Curated annotation (Swiss-Prot):
Lineage: Eukaryota, Metazoa, Chordata, Craniata, Vertebrata
Record's compositionally biased regions (Basic and acidic residues): 28-44
Function: May play a role in microtubule deacetylation by negatively regulating the SIRT2 deacetylase activity toward alpha-tubulin and thereby participate in the control of cell cycle progression and genomic stability. In absence of reductive stress, acts as a pseudosubstrate for the CRL2(FEM1B) complex: associates with FEM1B via zinc, thereby preventing association between FEM1B and its substrates.
Protein species of origin: Mus musculus
Source domain of life: Eukaryota
Biological processes, Gene Ontology terms: chromosome segregation; negative regulation of protein ubiquitination; negative regulation of tubulin deacetylation; regulation of mitotic cell cycle
Entry's induction text: Up-regulated by cadmium in testis (at protein level). Up-regulated by curcumin.
PANTHER family: PROTEIN BEX4
This protein's name: Protein BEX4
């Protein structure tokens, strides 16, 4: 790729020389292009990348089965659906946060005997 950029720069300088010999003025754009191409050549990819904050899904209704049931009838089923809905919310949130949560290991009994951190 570097050779392509160098070839383009060489072609632009040749065109500029031809225009100067003819007495015509080279356009401002053609003067800036070689400089711009050199800048692009020196840049490293991925230098200006920001991390995005992952947002949790606000609507969990898609995961609740039988959501078109009439809420006034059913008695015991209503409580079961409510519990099931809260479990679905908890599980999906847990799945989304899992890559960001570190492993939590309990401290051994003698942890403070060997721990150097005050």
């Amino acid at each position: 790729m570097a050779s392509k950029f160098k070839q383009v720069i060489l072609d632009l300088t040749v065109e500029k020389d031809k225009k100067d010999k003819k007495g015509g003025k080279a356009s401002k754009q053609s003067e800036e292009e070689p400089h711009h191409l050199e800048e692009v050549e020196n840049k490293k990819p991925g230098g200006n990348v920001r991390r995005k904050v992952r947002r949790l899904v606000p609507n969990f209704l898609w995961a609740i089965p039988n959501r078109h049931v009439d809420r006034n009838e059913g008695g015991e089923d209503v409580g079961r659906f409510v519990v099931q809905g809260t479990e679905v919310k908890r599980k999906t949130t847990e799945q989304q946060v899992r890559p960001y949560r570190r492993f939590r290991t309990p401290e051994p009994d003698n942890h403070y005997d060997f721990c150097l951190i005050p």
